[in-house]
Amino acid sequence: MFQKSIMIDIEDYASQAPQYYSENIPGLLEKTLVGQRPGNFLDCGCGDGSLLYGLKKKKCLENWKISAIDLSESRIRRIKLIDPNIHAMVDNVEVLHTVPDQSVDLLVSTQVIEHVDDKKTFQAISRVLKKDGRIYLSTVFKKWYGWYFYRNNGRWVLDPTHLREYYEENQLMGLIFSNGFQVLENRKSLFWFPVADFFVRWAGVANRNFYEKKIVSLLRRIQVPILGYYNWELVLKKL
C-alpha cells in the first residue's frame, strides 16, 4: 500500500493496523459495478482484503476476473485465504509492474493514494487501464478546520502515514485530467468513526471476521463525526 521510501516497515504496519471484514461496501462502488460489464477487476492497494471480502460476500464480483496488489507479503497471503482464485500479487501501486498494459476494466483504490506518490500512481493506473475503463477512487479531503489526534510533519492528520491530505479539488483534478480521465462521479461525505473500532484495535483483536458478530455489528452503528474530514469518492473513465 505504501512506497518503500516511507520510513515505516510495511509488515509492522500491516500487523499494527489490521483491517476487519464485514459486508459493508461503498454504495457508489456498488452502483458502478452494477453498470459495468464483467471483465478484469483490480484492487490497487488491497490491504487485508476487507473490500474484496465484502464484495465477494454480496456477490458483486460474480463473473469478474479478480486481481489484487499490495506491498505487504503478509496481506497478500490473507487475500488468498478469502478466495484462492484471486490473482494476488506483491506490487507497488506507483509502478504496477505485475499488471500488463491496458488490461484492467475496473480498478478500485480506496484510501491509498494519500499514502503514495500520486503522480507516479496515476501514470501507472493510466497505463494498465483499458480505454473506457473505470476507476473507483476514494481518498481523504480535509477542510481548513479539520482535526484529528495524529500528527505528522507538525500537522494534525487523520493517519500519521499520510504523505498528503487533499484540501483543494484541483490538487487531484490536475492529475486526473492530465492522465486522460473524465470525471463521472464526484462526492464527498463526512467521515464517521465507529466508537467500537477504538476498543477493538486497543484490545488487539486478531480475528479479521470479528465485525461479523451481531453484537459487534450493532455496536459499530454508534459513531462520532470527524469534523472537517471527508471521504472523497470519484468515479473516473479513461478516454
What residue spans do the PLM features occupy?
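Conserved N-terminal segment of class I S-adenosyl-L-methionine
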Residues: 1-100, 106-108, 122, 229-232
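A structural micro-motif
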Residues: 64, 86, 133, 181-182
